[in-house]
Curated annotation (Swiss-Prot):
Cofactor note: Binds 1 zinc ion per subunit.
CC annotations in GO: plasma membrane
Leading EC class: hydrolase
Subunit-structure text: Homohexamer.
InterPro entries (alphabetical): AAA+_ATPase, AAA_lid_3, ATPase_AAA_core, ATPase_AAA_CS, FtsH, P-loop_NTPase, Pept_M41_FtsH_extracell, Peptidase_M41
Organism of this sequence: Borreliella burgdorferi (strain ZS7) (Borrelia burgdorferi)
Transmembrane segments: 21-41, 121-141
Name assigned to this protein: ATP-dependent zinc metalloprotease FtsH
């Protein structure tokens, strides 16, 4: 897509290198020439140092032609001879010779005073440090210009530019998101035919903010808009604006918008806008001045855009809550488009696109994969296909098999399996009882998600995992489902108490999940009986100040006590119910734990056959890269 740009950039960089090398060579030649000219202008003589007695001998014999007195202790003299046979000497006067001048006059020796005429080696030694210093400075200059520092061009925008017509990405390359694409087609139409809107007085939004979770395709959508409209596309990350130098961010904003105006119609796309567009606050010590200057300049530039400029500013963020309100007012990013996670049909379409360049086995059903990946983003699905391809290539296969996809699932969800990790029989039994407690509750709780797989093979920091798959895409969750989640979290804790008589440190993650859910029930979701339907979380604290530092709590100490009592009551009731179920079906719990010790990994189908449960009619044989992992038994800090 950027082949021509790269060729042009390479050509320019080569020309720059040639120019710099030519300049460096010219400077070196100039210095060498100056050295030799200095040497030859002085006569090119090379004076040989001799003892003072030798000088006296030449003088007594009348052979000294001329003498140059350098100082009171050093003279240079020339011995008579033919024009081609003169000898040049220098000597040091070891004592004060008061008769030397009169003797030179009597011998009619040409007498003068001057500075020492150094030899070529002496000249080189004197000038060499300057030459080395100049070369060192030159290379430092070249590195800062051509390398990552760019000291002398730090005020210039480093946005990636995609020329008009060379961006081949269109809406056809974006699977799903039909409502989002419909919203963005207005932008495309405006860039293609602005007079259509101007004729009736309509004003297209100056800024379009794409809001969504990471990996949902916000950047791809922005490129698709530029590709559909056939205009230039400037892409820059919000973090690229701000540097350590004061004023750099504002300068880069000005340069970016100047370039956009020169290349209109075009699109400016700022990724991760929250890196530069966070709410302006008091801060501590003024450490945010540079970022705020950059934000102010961005606001000014967007105000300076008129409809006649044919420049659209698009941005993406997954944190719209932290953006400065001035960015979101009409006239700036006044249109917000939410890019949501794909549903089952969209996931299948995304998988189809990413699998075009891979060789999938005929037994792989992309519809099944899509159904088994609720909550997965487009990036998750792309990573899933790629991991499966890597595993198949590692095994020297010609195509990707179902087992490769399953292995890729486990790797993405739980980390690399540590099959070589040494685990004692006692630790393996503890982990088996822990995971069996989680797994068994899935079959006796009405609102729990179906179990998919349970394993005691260590992966990452987890010694074992019991994870489930929702029956369908879930947009919300009710109170009964939340309570069952908490009970399943306590399944490992209760099982350890029942079968081992003591609990391990592996319950830490379970307790953390259970407590978090219970607190949200009471303080955010209005599910507490004593506190009632009230929202008790203060989310309006200044962005740059810790909440406990910036303002007091949003509720009284009396209310806080009620919240604590309510949370504790919910947790205790869930733990009791989980323990009662496991005690009632202890035989099945022990049987499942022993089978886990033996086989290490069991699927839902295998657990049902082992414990005599009815087969799951809705069972599907794949995984979710974003499945609801119920419980992860963490590392045992004891060793």
């Amino acid at each position: 897509m950027n082949g021509n740009n790269n060729m042009n950039n390479n050509g320019k960089s080569n020309n720059k290198k040639k120019n710099k090398n030519w300049i460096l060579g010219l400077v070196v030649v100039f210095l060498i020439s100056a050295i030799f000219m200095s040497y030859f202008i002085r006569g090119g003589e090379s004076y040989k140092n001799v003892p003072y007695s030798t000088f006296q001998s030449y003088l007594d014999n009348g052979l000294v032609e001329s003498v140059v007195i350098i100082d009171k202790n050093l003279i240079q003299f020339v011995v008579k001879g033919s024009n081609f046979a003169k000898s040049y000497f220098s000597t040091s006067i070891p004592y004060l010779d008061i008769n030397l001048l009169s003797e030179l006059k009597n011998k009619k020796v040409e007498l003068s005073s001057g500075k020492s005429q150094a030899s070529l080696i002496g000249v080189l030694l004197q000038t060499l440090p300057w030459i080395l210093f100049f070369i060192f400075f030159f290379f430092i200059f070249r590195q800062t210009q051509g390398g990552g520092g760019k000291v002398f061009t730090f005020g210039k925008s480093n946005a990636q530019k995609y020329e008009a017509g060379k961006n081949k990405i269109t809406f056809k390359d974006v699977a799903g998101q039909e409502e989002v694409k419909q919203e963005l087609r207005e932008v495309v139409e405006f860039l293609k035919n602005p007079k259509k809107f101007e004729k009736i007085g309509a004003k297209i939004p100056k800024g379009v903010l794409l809001v969504g979770s990471p990996g949902t395709g916000k950047t791809l959508l922005a490129k698709a808009v530029a590709g559909e409209a056939g205009v230039s596309f400037f892409h820059m990350s919000g973090s690229d604006f701000v540097e350590m130098f004061v004023g750099v961010g504002a300068s880069r904003v000005r340069d970016l918008f100047d370039n956009a105006r020169k290349n209109s119609p075009c699109i400016i796309f700022i990724d991760e806008l929250d890196a530069v567009g966070r709410s302006r606050g008091a801060g501590l010590g003024g450490g945010h001045d540079e970022r705020e200057q950059t934000l102010n300049q961005l606001l000014v530039e967007m105000d300076g855009f008129g409809t006649h400029t044919n420049v659209i500013v698009m941005a993406a963020t997954n944190r719209p809550d932290v953006l400065d309100s001035a960015l979101l007012r009409p006239g700036r990013f006044d249109r917000q488009v939410t890019v949501s996670l794909p549903d089952i049909k969209e996931r299948e379409a995304i998988l189809n696109i990413h699998s075009l360049k891979t060789k999938l086995s005929k037994d792989i059903n992309l519809q099944v994969i899509a159904r088994a990946t609720p909550g997965a983003s487009g990036a998750d699905l792309a990573n899933l296909i790629n991991e499966g391809a890597l595993i198949a290539a590692r095994n020297n296969q010609d195509e990707i098999l179902m087992k490769d996809m399953e292995e890729a699932r486990d790797k993405i969800l739980m980390g690399v399996a540590k099959k070589s990790m040494t685990i004692t029989d006692r630790q393996k039994l503890e982990t088996a009882y822990h995971e069996a407690g989680h797994a068994l509750l899935h079959y006796y709780l009405e609102h729990a998600d179906p179990l998919h797989k349970v394993t005691i093979i260590p992966r990452g920091r987890a010694l074992g995992v019991a994870f489930s798959l929702p029956r369908e895409d879930r947009l919300s969750i009710n109170k009964h489902q939340i309570l069952d989640k908490i009970k399943i979290c306590y399944g490992g804790y209760a099982s350890e108490q029942i079968n081992l008589g003591v609990t391990t440190a592996g319950v830490q993650n379970d307790l953390m999940q259970a407590t978090s859910l219970a607190k949200k029930m009471v303080t955010e979701w209005g599910m507490g009986e004593e506190v009632g339907p009230i929202f008790l979380v203060d989310d309006e604290a200044p962005i740059f100040l810790p909440k406990e530092f910036s303002k007091a709590k949003a509720y009284s100490e009396n209310t806080a006590d009620k919240v604590d009592r309510e949370v504790k009551r919910i947790l205790e009731e869930c733990l009791k119910e989980a323990s009662d179920i496991l005690l009632k079906h202890k035989d099945q719990l022990v049987k499942l734990a022993k089978e886990l010790v033996l086989k290490e990994t069991l699927t839902d189908k295998e657990v049902r056959e082992l414990l005599g449960f009815e087969a799951n009619k809705d069972e599907y044989d794949l995984f979710s890269s974003d499945s609801t992992t119920k419980e992860v038994k963490g590392e045992d800090v004891k060793g």
